[in-house]
From Swiss-Prot:
The keyword Ribonucleoprotein applies. GO terms for molecular function: structural constituent of ribosome. This is Small ribosomal subunit protein bS21. GO terms for cellular component: ribonucleoprotein complex; ribosome. The lineage of its organism: Bacteria, Pseudomonadati, Thermodesulfobacteriota, Desulfovibrionia, Desulfovibrionales. GO terms for biological process: translation.
C-alpha cells in the first residue's frame, strides 16, 4: 500500500498529496479497485484477455504496414 512519509522540514500538504497520488497511480490501486468492484466470471475474463491480445496484434500489424 502506498504511503508518503514527510521529513521534518516538509509541511506542504499539496506536495505530499501529489506524491501520494503518483504512488497510488504507479501501484495501480485505482484500476485494481475498478476491476474488483463487480465479480467477473473466469470465462468473461478469458474472452476480454483474448480480445485485447487480438487488438494489440492488429494494431502491431497495422503499424508495420504503415512503415
Amino acid at each position: 500500500m502506498p504511503g508518503v512519509y514527510l521529513n521534518d522540514d516538509e509541511y506542504n500538504f499539496d506536495i505530499a498529496l501529489r506524491r501520494f497520488k503518483k504512488q497510488v497511480e504507479k501501484a495501480g490501486v485505482l484500476s485494481e479497485m475498478k476491476k474488483r468492484q463487480h465479480y467477473e466470471k473466469p470465462s468473461v475474463m478469458r474472452k476480454k484477455k483474448k480480445a485485447a491480445a487480438r487488438k494489440r496484434l492488429l494494431k502491431k500489424i497495422r503499424k508495420m504496414n504503415m512503415a
